[in-house]
A protein has these predicted regions:
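C-terminal hydrophobic helical "lid"/dimerization subdomain
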Residues: 2-10, 251-255, 297-356
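Glycine-rich beta-strand-centered segment in the early N-terminal region that forms part
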Residues: 26-41, 52-97, 139
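Mid-domain Rossmann-like dinucleotide-binding core that forms the NAD(H)/NADP(H) cofactor-binding site
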Residues: 142-222, 226, 241
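Glycine-rich cofactor phosphate-binding loops and adjacent beta1-alpha1 units
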Residues: 163, 189, 206, 211-288, ...
Length: 356
């Protein structure tokens, strides 16, 4: 297989309200690399953070892609043209201090690896380190659409692994966007007892209940701290997972967690924001606070295994589909935080009937 053309269409990001369809050369590949024709790629919430993207723009976004291998460079023996794959956009060096400790996402090489140019393009090049460490063949029963959730759900799986639960623990998830729903799906596989879901959107609260949350709380019309304790024998949550990237959400999480509990921070506020915390109260509460950035090859393989086994439902999380010219609309939809979760981009156009 070879690409039909030497140029391709890409969605070039300049700002949240300025995404342009442009033409770029189809990337050449070298030893150990593969060229992939993008079938579908999810839009990540991080790809709407202008403070994060400003220094990188203009840029082709998209790091949750699935596609078909078009060609493989010399030395590639695990993949052949026609293979259906998901490619993770980061890979560790496997030889540094952090890699030796299993903290792969802290590896200096990790965030320097990338897809060329990105998933919002008709084709992309996967460099050799990505091919070697974190390119996954999709099993026959895992669709291209389902494969797009591997990377983001792997991030939430990593967060749960860093926040181990005891049987019967009461947990709370703050923020019910796509990532919050991923936490919910995975928490239903854990030994948790009550699962509280918190959001300002009634639509998202209803969705959370359908995915396994036992209680939905809306901070807009009730005192969620008092309500959670009323429903939990006077106690706070044993573990709180915060997915909203705001200090207010972090403060809410700390207020909801029980003494001796765990607070997991799953999304970053803008740089420079300082979190004022009562340090004395925090000390005596013995609350453990952790955070997680990205995911690695152990997590992505685990999510693929869950998808193949039918243990998680990708279809329930995908709400919108767009062609390449719909990236800007998808960004605005995500920023609106309305009746949407995951939007997929189809660079070659949305099929009449997405692959089952």
């Amino acid at each position: 297989m070879k690409p039909e053309h030497t140029t391709m269409r890409v969605a070039m990001y300049y700002k949240n309200d300025d995404v342009r369809i442009e033409e770029k050369p189809v990337p050449d590949i070298g030893p150990g690399e593969i060229l992939v024709q993008t079938v579908a790629c999810g839009l990540c919430g991080g790809e709407t953070m202008e403070w994060y993207l400003a220094s990188r723009a203009p840029k082709v976004l998209g790091h949750e892609p699935t596609g078909i291998v078009v060609s493989a460079g010399p030395g590639v023996d695990k993949f052949v043209p026609g293979d259906r794959v998901h490619v993770h956009h980061h890979a560790p060096c496997m030889s540094c201090h952090f890699c030796h400790r299993g903290r792969f996402t802290l590896c200096e090489s990790f965030s320097k690896s990338y897809l060329d140019p990105g998933g919002f393009a008709e084709y992309f090049r996967a460099p050799a380190d990505l091919v070697r460490f974190d390119t996954l063949k999709l099993p026959p029963n895992v669709s291209f659409e389902a494969g797009t959730i591997i990377e983001p759900m792997a991030c939430t799986l990593k967060g749960i692994r860093q926040t181990p639960l005891h049987p019967g623990d009461t947990v709370a998830v703050i923020g019910l966007g796509f990532m919050g729903m991923c936490y919910l799906e995975l928490l239903t596989l854990e030994p948790a007892g009550k699962i509280f879901a918190l959001d300002f959107s009634e639509w998202r609260l209803e969705k959370a209940l359908s995915l396994g949350a036992t209680h939905g709380l809306n901070p807009a019309n009730e005192d969620v701290q008092e309500k959670l304790r009323d429903l939990n024998h006077g106690r706070g949550a044993d573990a709180v997972f915060v997915t909203a990237p705001t200090l207010k959400a972090w403060e809410s999480g700390l207020a909801l967690v029980e003494r001796g509990g765990q607070l997991h921070l799953g999304a970053p506020p803008p740089p420079g924001e300082i979190w004022p915390v009562d340090s004395n109260a925090l000390y005596f509460s013995e609350v453990q606070i952790n955070s997680t950035y990205s995911a690695h090859h152990v997590d992505t393989q685990a999510v693929l295994d869950l998808l193949e086994a039918g243990r998680v439902n990708a279809d329930a999380l995908i709400t919108h589909r767009f062609g390449l010219d719909g990236v800007e609309k998808a960004i605005q939809l995500l920023l609106g935080a309305g009746d949407s979760l995951k939007s997929l981009i189809y660079p070659s156009g949305v099929p009449d009937r997405p692959e089952a």
